[in-house]
Amino acid sequence: KGYEPIVEIMIPLTVTREELALARGWVEEVLADINSRPVPKAKKGEKSIKRPKVSIGTMIETPRAALRADELAEVSDFFSCGTNDLTQMTFGFSRDDVESRMMPAYLEAGLLKRTPFETIDQNGVGELVFMAAERGRKVKRSLKLGVCGEHGGDPESIGMFYRAGLNYVSCSPYRVPIARLSAAQAVIGGAKT
């Protein structure tokens, strides 16, 4: 009571405008049904009940979605870059399969500087995030952009997300304090990392 919730419905793994438009239509049908019902009356002394505005967006978690972000933005209120899946699909390997054996060998041999599942690969996955942000905002200037996944709690990755123009990061609860600090440092310091 008394709160104004931010309601966002995120449609995962979309790869075409048509697919997202279809799924958005299903969500809008349900919302129209809900909105056609009477709003319960507020009790005496309480604020009147208002229906929250509902935003409908999609996850950018495949390379194709990043490449076609301009088309997806036409039918989306926001994007959330799902960097765990985007990293897997960009590198072509499963996080579960590589972290125990292959990744330590890659790091030891110097093939990668760090695991791309902890700190975003700025030259590959990061480029896709920049591309999605740029292409999406070219179509819809006010498009809300964010990231979800473990990268949302990594200081170096947060700096890159700030430079890409993302509005928010989300991460595991235990990473929230460092994410907040890193986001503030990115804003104050201009995100040079």
Predicted regions and their residues:
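Conserved alpha/beta-domain cores
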Residues: 1-193
